[in-house]
From Swiss-Prot:
It comes from Pseudomonas aeruginosa (strain ATCC 15692 / DSM 22644 / CIP 104116 / JCM 14847 / LMG 12228 / 1C / PRS 101 / PAO1). One of its GO terms (molecular function) is ferric iron binding. Belongs to the frataxin family. GO terms for cellular component: cytosol. The keyword Iron applies. Pfam families: Frataxin_Cyay (PF01491). Signal peptide: none annotated. The keyword Repeat does not apply. HAMAP family: CyaY. InterPro entries: CyaY (IPR047584), Frataxin/CyaY (IPR002908), Frataxin/CyaY_sf (IPR036524), Frataxin_CS (IPR020895). This is Iron-sulfur cluster assembly protein CyaY.
Length: 108
């Protein structure tokens, strides 16, 4: 995958994540700057999605740890580089843990 496609994919993904949070009832702050999406929950915890262009990976930092995701062309999903778990499942779990609400991330 070339760098331009990688950035397009991450831009689209970050917009989907922002939209899912905007549609939720959670009290949180979203900041997207320099390719890094930061979600600040009411309790002060954060969920951070950052692009790692040289590796063509998306990194997620959550209260439960750090996770690296690769884009799977066959499924059109970002998958954990070890367990192959889809990004949406991790975001759902982290949001429930940190924000106390079950937020769906369709298509992720």
């Amino acid at each position: 995958m070339n760098e331009a496609r990688f950035h397009d994919l991450v831009d689209a993904l970050q917009q989907q994540v922002e939209d899912a949070f905007d549609d939720s009832d959670l009290d949180l702050d979203l900041e997207n700057a320099g390719g890094v999406l930061t979600v600040r929950f009411e309790n002060g915890s954060q969920l951070i999605l950052s692009r790692q262009a040289p590796l063509r990976q998306l990194w997620v930092a959550a209260k439960s740890g750090g996770f690296h995701f690769d884009y799977d062309e066959a499924s059109g999903l970002w998958r954990h580089d070890g367990s192959q778990e889809p990004l949406g499942a991790l975001l759902n779990r982290a949001t429930l843990e940190q924000g106390g609400e079950d937020v769906e991330f369709p298509g992720l």
